Amino acid sequence: MSNINKEIECCPPFDPAPWDDKIVEWVNKPFVKDKVFTIFYMPVRFGAAIRRVDKKVTKAAAKMVDWLCLCDHTSKWNMDVYVAVDKEIPDAHNKLLSGKFYSKVYEGNFNNTGKWCQDYTGIVKEKGLVIKKMYMWYTTCPKCAKKYGKNYVVIISELV
């Protein structure tokens, strides 16, 4: 992928500190939307979707911001992905997100996702916040998670 530092095989290392237990406000933050086929919520050819987006981003002389990729599991068979970019990308489905978002970082095997979502929902309620839309950010592919020794997943929700 052209936007990745050549020393990094695939996914850049992830620093959880800026994302753990944080509220951020976005005003017209640009994203590019793509889709990934899933089988019972498990993505199939996720990397192909990222490569499609990267090709369009590179062609537009743009950048993927923080490798932020919000995943919206719309059904057992589909996941919409929103990749943060630094400008509008021609020939892409551009989407602007605005609002307050709460993020919490989790680490471990993907089969813990259900537990993480329950924990996250509890934390949000304890803080007196209300979720409008929940996204998952899988910060590295399984191969890179193994290489780095950590599998960070960030749950990010748009708040009411």
Regions found by a protein language model. Name each.
Residues 1-160:
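A solvent-exposed interaction/effector surface
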